[in-house]
UniProtKB/Swiss-Prot annotation:
Record note on quaternary structure: Binds to the N-terminal domain of the chaperone ClpA.
Gene designation: clpS1
A Pfam family reported for this protein in Swiss-Prot or TrEMBL: ClpS
Protein name: ATP-dependent Clp protease adapter protein ClpS 1
Gene3D superfamilies tied to this protein: 3.30.1390.10
NCBIfam families attached to this UniProt entry: PRK00033.1-2 (NF000669), PRK00033.1-5 (NF000672)
Taxonomic source organism: Mesorhizobium japonicum (strain LMG 29417 / CECT 9101 / MAFF 303099) (Mesorhizobium loti (strain MAFF 303099))
GO biological process: protein catabolic process; proteolysis
Function as written in the Swiss-Prot or TrEMBL entry: Involved in the modulation of the specificity of the ClpAP-mediated ATP-dependent protein degradation.
InterPro entries xref list: ClpS, ClpS_core, Ribosomal_bL12_C/ClpS-like
């Protein structure tokens, strides 16, 4: 029976060096979700989309809708790729279901 000491074999004893590598976590790329102006989608529908899918209050949604109307494009929000992709898909599906040609796109920030 052995006690907690060694087994008499001194091989393998020595100084070990443990190195720690710092991994830099890269922040995910961000994407802007944009709504594009068209001549057919009602302004109220755009406001509804902004409230429903981007959690904008009525005032912010109206401000963005007017920016889209006057400048041709407006930013709905900035998200990671997966979230932005989902938002674009949800908006496009909702617009099609309601027979509106509204376009929603994403671009890398």
């Amino acid at each position: 029976m052995q006690n907690g000491g060694g087994d008499g074999n001194e091989a393998g004893r020595g100084t070990a060096v443990i190195t720690r590598t710092k991994t830099k976590t890269k922040k995910p790329s961000l994407y802007r979700v944009l709504i594009l102006n068209d001549d057919y989608t009602p302004m109220e529908f755009v406001v509804h989309v902004l409230e429903r899918f981007f959690q904008k209050d009525r005032e912010a949604a109206t401000r963005i809708m007017l920016h889209v109307h006057n400048h041709g494009v407006g930013e709905c929000g900035v998200y990671t790729f997966e979230v932005a992709e989902t938002k674009v898909s949800q908006v496009m599906d909702f617009a099609r279901q309601n027979q509106h040609p509204l376009q929603c796109v994403m671009e890398k920030k």
